[in-house]
């Protein structure tokens, strides 16, 4: 009985961690919705738009 109890507790602990990660992953896209999606010569890195030199060449001033 002790081994069964330990196995159940282990399974619960292992299953609890991915649910926390899933919650963080689901929470992450929200800032992208607040900020307009990057368009044209920009691509998204985290919550920032970065200029794509390869696609559009040097930055125009």
From Swiss-Prot:
The record describes the protein's role as:
Toxin that is lethal to crab. Does not produce the typical symptoms associated with sodium channel toxins in crabs, suggesting that it likely does not act on sodium channels.
Q: Which ranges are cleaved off as propeptide?
A: 20-31
Note from the entry: A synonymy between H.magnifica and R.crispa is controversial.
**Transcription regulation recorded as keyword:** no
Which residues belong to the signal peptide in this entry?
1-19
Query: Which residues pair up as cystines?
Result: 38-49, 41-56
Q: What protein does this entry describe?
A: U-stichotoxin-Hcr1b
Superkingdom of this protein's organism: Eukaryota
Q: Where, if anywhere, are coiled coils annotated?
A: none
Q: Per the UniProt entry, what species is this protein from, by scientific name?
A: Radianthus crispa
Keywords assigned by UniProt, alphabetized: Disulfide bond, Hydroxylation, Nematocyst, Secreted, Signal, Toxin
Provide the primary localization.
secreted
Question: Where in or outside the cell is it found?
Answer: Secreted; Nematocyst
**What family does the entry list?**
Belongs to the Hau1a/HC18/HC19 family.
